[in-house]
């Protein structure tokens, strides 16, 4: 009879070498990551990229900032999971930042927050007044360097992760130095839960 189930482990090895040349020849870009593709667990993908379909062309990652910021006095962070995306060499204007945050809210249904660690080593903009009193802790915990932008999301764990994933994608597309737009990068997401809580 016909085999009804094709497990990922059976499918992966034979199929991996087929993808890169097909995408390189017929896709928009002419470069694709070679087999074997990276394996990322569902939980790691959600924690690191905020998505179970991560765009690996973007070099930005999501960090957990709950311990650092949940008690900073900013209402939306209280009692919630807080996620952060640190973007070095960020040159966006206030108007552009507002635009990015608006896009994040439209796409995810949740607000994005932010602050900057400026060239003078000061916390400025967005929710800076809540973060400035813990500047030293923030610099250490998030690995901040002068001239960086920090995008923030908050909510129940899955909502904070997914909103951070949207924010990460928007920031990657906005910052050409953080996204390699001229290639395909493949991965396998493994160990999916049976359902999301």
Specify the residue positions occupied by each region the protein language model found.
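Class II aminoacyl-tRNA synthetase catalytic cores and aaRS-like
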Residues: 1-197
